[in-house]
Amino acid sequence: MNIENIKSQFPIFSKKINGKSLVYLDSSNSSQKPMCVINRLNDFYKNEFSNIGRSIHSLAVNATNKFEETRISIKNFINAKFKEEIIFTKNATEAINLVATTFGQQNIKKGDEIIITELEHHSNYVPWHFLRETKKAIIKFAPINEDGDIIIDKFKELIT
């Protein structure tokens, strides 16, 4: 894997900020797009855009079919058992909130423990904090080594 080759596919990374190459680490809510995605979205918006799953006209049917084909591609890529396991959200922030407010509200009980790392993005801390407050759960923090990896032995000690 050649990181420079990968970065070259993202137009934003040719930009300099204060004379330095851009390093973008805030991808929880939105992420930078490679040119192939920008081009495909542009083509979709110009030639195919329609509601998904809401109409029977040809543009809507085509958009719905592509949407469902994408769901199947992702299912296959991550080796999910069923395509219905693939749920699209706007971003990771929304996805984390969805898990915390659905699964969490229904299944977490007083005294249950939620383990997250010390390096979590704010968007992966806040939903669990609210769950801790509403359900009286306990948040534990898995320690990280100097390379940013979870210290597995310490992590295992947190599981009770």
Label the model's feature ranges.
Residues 1-160:
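Pyridoxal 5′-phosphate
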